[in-house]
């Protein structure tokens, strides 16, 4: 993990997300506290637990994006899940421990990619030798191999077909799901058992040199890395640096004025308590402790209130951050300021067709005005409204772009009014189109 200060973390988040400084500060401090804990004396380290966060704010204001960018910044195992997908233990469906199992699998994939990158050169060399064996035979003279090696590296043989043996990873009995468990018993993996019992099976594939190159490098890299070490490091990464973003937490808050049992509400909250507090979860990779996993819960809380959550769950989410609804100025900044702003994305998409797309300042102002107006009059979906309006605005240009190579399109305020103005002004049409 990079040892960034909270100020540096906020500055990095500012490159991608507009506003929401309170949320950025909260996650920046939480991330820095991980590094601080690792510097603490050994006898204190186990006692310092992460201060989990509850983000409160309407949809489309940046709750998910803050967490996603934070995970990329920390290079940490990250999982985003909706709280509504889980049911109480004992009922048909996924139980909350599946969160940890999925997080471990995400970490294994992340660590494996890092290990593959470390042996990339050796894997490429071995893949090249296998391709040469397929092209000229393993018994060919070294001079012949060198001639073909030069041609291979120059790309002259890319379209030539070769027969290669690849490890057979397909298994019709890959996973045993027990009835009613919703895949949560994934530690019982028949594919692993049968694969070890039958040894490494291979299958012969006829393919071109170009198409074979990448899977060959991946296969050779997997032979060079230690799978057990990957699993050990993945479990450690989850236990020390894992981040879980628990969205729609407000949807499992049981409101006081509603009676009756509801398996997807209070029961799920009770199941979440030990997970967030710290417990040990069995996975097919081994036991995983959740004591130091950072949980970031979020919800709009339009109907329910944070106080409708179980008191014990509220206590396990001590940091409360309220995200502000987006203003017209925020919407305008979202269009132009982030490193991968929506305007830049659409310009890049059109550039692929050799079409130059430019937006006048007046057009950007009109788009922001319309987004704010529709959000206020119909349903506030935050920054996502900008995408809806831009798609509608650029519909004709996107459709005709392949036939307009070399041309330049300038989006003006009048063009925005012409394409979207009538829809934005008509509340009934906006409900269905914008």
UniProtKB/Swiss-Prot annotation:
Binding site for ATP: 18, 60-65, 247, 312, 384
Cysteines joined through disulfide linkages: none
One of the GO BP terms on file: protein unfolding
Record keyword Transmembrane present: no
Location(s) in or outside the cell: Cytoplasm
Record key words, sorted: ATP-binding, Chaperone, Cytoplasm, Nucleotide-binding, Stress response
Pfam families recorded: AAA, AAA_2
Keyword Iron (UniProt): no
SUPFAM superfamilies: P-loop containing nucleoside triphosphate hydrolases (SSF52540)
Example GO molecular function: proteasome-activating activity
Recorded superkingdom: Bacteria
Chief location bin: cytoplasm
CC annotations in GO: HslUV protease complex
Its biological purpose: ATPase subunit of a proteasome-like degradation complex; this subunit has chaperone activity. The binding of ATP and its subsequent hydrolysis by HslU are essential for unfolding of protein substrates subsequently hydrolyzed by HslV. HslU recognizes the N-terminal part of its protein substrates and unfolds these before they are guided to HslV for hydrolysis.
Xref: HAMAP family: HslU (MF_00249)
Family per similarity comment: Belongs to the ClpX chaperone family. HslU subfamily.
Quaternary structure and partners: A double ring-shaped homohexamer of HslV is capped on each side by a ring-shaped HslU homohexamer. The assembly of the HslU/HslV complex is dependent on binding of ATP.
Name of the protein: ATP-dependent protease ATPase subunit HslU
Organism encoding this protein: Hyphomonas neptunium (strain ATCC 15444)
